[in-house]
Amino acid sequence: MAKYTGPSCRLCRREGGKLFLKGEKCFSDKCPVSIRAYAPGQHGQRRGRVSEYGGQLREKQKIRRIYGVLEGQFRRYFQRASQARGVTGELLLRFLELRLDNVAYRLGFGASRAEARQVVRHGHILVNGRRVDIPSYQVRAGDVVSVAEAARTHIRIAASVEATAGRGFPEWVSMDTTELKATIKAVPVREDMAPDLNEQVVVELYSK
């Protein structure tokens, strides 16, 4: 599946809720989902009945778009989760949550996951003191994630960290906003992740 390059806000409206793809705009009154809470297009306000398969597909697309991964990547995460010991749906979300680009976003090193991914790719993020520029890199409990010295003066990073601090950092990280450094205290459990995601229907979709 090709990468989507259209307006991000249309994806949020298509999925019927905020996917937090546009940084601070998503938390403001200017968010299109708050203004027009219906699907885009001529017939967007007339949502038809959705079949069981259609509902499963929509939830899969929603999760995939939130974390910004392509279909092939998403399926590989599911296969890995289904082969591991534990609850498949929860493991799937955990693998996505522990991607380096998502961790960078959770720490405020990017205003959105797309921006955090760019920060990672540009080599501005260190893991245990070593530069890592792979967005899909899996962070582990005990890892220390920080901003490289040369990037600590970037205004956008500083502003994003401040905004994220105001909303609160995840319980599974210990963040030092002065040093722009965080320790991963533990892997996130289901209660630490978005409560409005229904990962079980994705498991059912891929299990057919």
From Swiss-Prot:
Gene3D superfamilies: Ribosomal Protein S4 Delta 41, Chain A, domain 1, RNA-binding S4 domain. GO terms for cellular component: small ribosomal subunit. It holds the Pfam family Ribosomal_S4. Belongs to the universal ribosomal protein uS4 family. Part of the 30S ribosomal subunit. Contacts protein S5. The interaction surface between S4 and S5 is involved in control of translational fidelity. It comes from Acidithiobacillus ferrooxidans (strain ATCC 23270 / DSM 14882 / CIP 104768 / NCIMB 8455). One of its GO terms (biological process) is ribosomal small subunit biogenesis. Keywords: Ribonucleoprotein, Ribosomal protein, RNA-binding, rRNA-binding. One of the primary rRNA binding proteins, it binds directly to 16S rRNA where it nucleates assembly of the body of the 30S subunit. Residues 98-159 form the S4 RNA-binding domain. GO terms for molecular function: rRNA binding; structural constituent of ribosome. This is Small ribosomal subunit protein uS4.
